[in-house]
Structure formats: structure tokens, C-alpha cells
Amino acid sequence: MDRSRRTQEDPDLGMLSGRTLFGLQRELFAALAEQGHPGLRPRHGAVLAYLDDDGSRATDLAARSGRHKQVIGTLVDELVELGYVERRRDPADRRAKLIVPTERGRDFIVRSDAILAELEAAHARAVGEQAYAEFKRVFRLVAARQAALTSDAGT
């Protein structure tokens, strides 16, 4: 069997993960654009998906998202310009800055969470609630194992 046929019939974990991620992102960001958030792109999720309500440090966002701190800094600059976050002094450490969602940012996060919950519910209905719950349980294990392997390798 040639490679292109094999990747269609029996895609590996990376291909399946990528297809799932990109498909979810297309659906999510199209819905968000219709709901008043047309300027955001999937890359902004590295900040907004991991941002605490009361703010997060850029170093924490980098660790949670797996992105380099410089990438997070660039994304935060874009999100500040778009009006989704602001930088504030961290009351716990006046030298540090917190990235805090604005009202627009909080609206985006609430809408995003609701859309993703509906997408997940639709998948659960399609494959069965129990099968979907088991899929998520196993996928979390695989993701955690992969993260541990990556961190053990020093990357």
C-alpha cells in the first residue's frame, strides 16, 4: 500500500491529533467570528485558552501551552492591541506583570468554552456518551505520557 493511501486509511496519532485540532479550530473560530470576534486566530489560543480569570504571568502561559515565552509575548502584544487582554502589575510581585482578560477577552473565553462544550457534546452523541468518555480518558493518558516523554528528553 502506498503512503498516501495508508495515511488516509490508517493515520498515525500525529495525523489524527492534527486533523482533530485543525477541524475544531476551524469550527470554533468561524463560530466566534459570527459572534463578534472576527480578529482572532487559533494561535491566540496559546494565551486565551490558558488564561486565569484574575490573570496569569507570561511564563505560566508558556508552560501551560507548551509555547516559548517569546511567542507568548508576541501573542500578548497582539491581544492587547485587539483589546482582549491587558498587562497589570502582579500584586504578589511588583516586578512581574499579569496578563488579565478585558471584558472583551472574558466574553471571548465564555463563548469559546460554550462552543467547545457543544462540539464535544455533538461528538459524544455521535459515537455514544460512554465511548466518548472512554476516548477522552485514554487520550488524556496518551497526552500526559507524551508530555512526560518530551519533558524527560529535555525539550
Regions found by a protein language model. Name each.
Residues 1-39:
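N-terminal leader segment of winged-helix/HTH proteins
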Residues 1-8, 130-155:
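C-terminal regulatory/oligomerization modules of transcriptional regulators
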Residues 11, 15, 46, 121-122:
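Positions in alpha-helical segments
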Residues 17-20, 24, 28-31, 65, ...:
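Alpha-helical linker/hinge and terminal dimerization helices associated
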Residues 18-21, 48, 52, 102, ...:
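Generic structural concept
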Residues 26-71, 154-155:
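N-terminal helix-turn-helix DNA-binding core of bacterial DNA-binding proteins
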Residues 77-140:
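Charged, amphipathic alpha-helical coiled-coil/dimerization segments
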